[in-house]
Amino acid sequence: MSDISKASLPKAIFLMGPTASGKTALAIELRKILPVELISVDSALIYKGMDIGTAKPNAEELLAAPHRLLNIRDPSQAYSAADFRRDALAEMADITAAGRIPLLVGGTMLYFKALLEGLSPLPSADPEVRARIEQQAAEQGWESLHRQLQEIDPVAAARIHPNDPQRLSRALEVFFISGKTLPELTQTSGDALPYQVHQFAIAPASRELLHQRIEQRFHQMLASGFEAEVRALFARGDLHTDLPSIRCVGYRQMWSYLEGEISYDEMVYRGVCATRQLAKRQITWLRGWEGVHWLDSEKPEQARDEVLQVVGAIAG
């Protein structure tokens, strides 16, 4: 696309970053200055009743800066990158039609990628193939199927944990139906995002600082009633660890504690470690991201001013 045709597209802002990096605070600050409306890009914040463990913006923050695509699914429901792209495009069109600018804020990098590049059509689920995979898992175990996936599709196998039957089953199913691996199918993207996008990533300058913030925030969540929040989900009786909602960082570890599998101290340790691992994956994604402007979360005023400097011209 030429620079001229790009310039004629509506504007959008991406504000990406690892967990606990101050994305929400910066987005709320920017909304006071720029004609933006916020869209959440987070696979955990979509769930109702999961507020504390996801660090969902509180009522006061949402009053100051409403976020779209929050609380749109029950924890029993799935939500794919394709679902997100469809919903985000609809919200972006609505915001643009009102003469304002979509500001997409969050840390689910797969969602940002799907939105920016489009999605390749994957084969539809096949009940017979799925049943065959599940039967094999029942007989041999999911670790055996993970080894099989390593031989077929080592790239997907590296991304999928052996204890993640939903994603593991889907990766194998896609190969058995199409004869192609997930990376092969996703190399050809669908429709690119029809917006002129300014992309920012915010993070602390040092990994140690981010680790400290993650640990502090996890303890703050516990002090704010995180255990009671998960107990309420646990008591429903229809939720389990195969669901994406309960596999969210923090929730999975608290669930193991409530099931009596680990001690409270072990839950805290694992929760902090899992959150740090999530942040590491997010930063790895962002380091390979093209055209991103990095911001230092320890200098919030400077970060705000840098965004304004880059996008200020579009505010009028």
From Swiss-Prot:
EC number(s) given by UniProt: 2.5.1.75
InterPro entries: Dimethylallyltransferase (IPR039657), IPT (IPR018022), P-loop_NTPase (IPR027417)
Region feature (Interaction with substrate tRNA): 42-45, 166-170, 247-252, 280-287
Reaction catalysed by this enzyme: adenosine(37) in tRNA + dimethylallyl diphosphate = N(6)-dimethylallyladenosine(37) in tRNA + diphosphate
Keyword ATP-binding: yes
Keywords of the record: ATP-binding, Magnesium, Nucleotide-binding, Transferase, tRNA processing
GO biological process: tRNA modification
Name used for this protein in its record: tRNA dimethylallyltransferase
Gene assigned in the entry: miaA
